A protein has these predicted regions:
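Active-site neighborhood for divalent-cation/phosphate handling
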Residues: 82, 86, 90-92, 97-148, ...
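Gly/Thr-rich phosphate-binding beta-strand-loop-beta motif of the actin/hexokinase/Hsp70
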Residues: 2-33, 126, 132, 136-169
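Hydrophobic residues at beta-strand termini and immediately following loops
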Residues: 40, 113, 169
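Conserved phosphate-binding loops in N-terminal lobes of ATP-dependent enzymes
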Residues: 5-110
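Glycine-rich phosphate-binding loop plus the immediately following alpha-helix
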Residues: 49, 163-178
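Residue-level detector of flexible, active-site-proximal loop/helix-junction positions
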Residues: 44, 117-119, 170-173
């Protein structure tokens, strides 16, 4: 039997309160090993939800963090990455300027995902983990999953491995502080 090729990649999430990066090695979906994980605090959500913009100071902070993450990737010899931003960037009026600045200053291309995809990705990962590592098959009647994030609340009903219903509300933990 042929041995699967070991690959490496970085997954970076630019969220409302943190920027996280996981470096991993993998041969497939069932064989993923986290090499290291970094987390940096940013107050992006509070700012965007209050002013509808990302300030120049916050942009600089994020650029510096991402430059550091890029350096760590170089040290590990990792070139492949996925960098996704969610609610705080998605709702910023100056989103395109921010994305352009990050690309020019760090070389990172940011994918801004919509709320439905953001929640779907989290739920798919959770369900897969429960089934493969938690020995927890989905109940026959389905399952209702709640995702409470900084920027929103998502409810997803899954039955027979299909999303039957999804509702997203703009009531997250950071928004409730406003």
């Amino acid at each position: 039997m042929a041995r699967k090729k070991l690959r490496s990649a970085a997954v970076i999430h630019l969220g409302s309160e943190n920027i996280t990066m996981q470096l991993m090695e993998y041969t497939g979906l069932d064989d993923i090993r986290i090499i290291t994980e970094l987390r940096s605090r940013v107050r992006l959500g509070e700012e965007t939800f209050q002013t509808r913009k990302i300030s120049f100071g916050t942009m600089l902070q994020i650029v510096e963090i991402l430059k550091g993450y890029r350096q760590v990737m170089r040290e590990y010899g990792i070139k492949s990455y996925i960098l996704q931003a969610t609610t705080a960037v998605r709702e910023a009026e100056n989103r395109q300027y921010f994305l352009d600045q990050v690309l020019v200053k760090t070389g990172f291309q940011i994918e801004v995902v919509n709320m439905s995809r953001e929640i779907y990705t989290k739920m798919a990962s959770l369900l897969r983990t429960l089934e493969t590592h938690g020995n927890m098959p989905l109940p026959r009647e389905g399952v209702l999953l709640a995702d409470i994030s900084s920027g929103g609340l998502g409810l997803t009903y899954v039955k027979d491995r299909e999303v039957k219903f999804q509702q997203n509300l703009h009531v997250g933990l950071v928004r409730l502080k406003e």
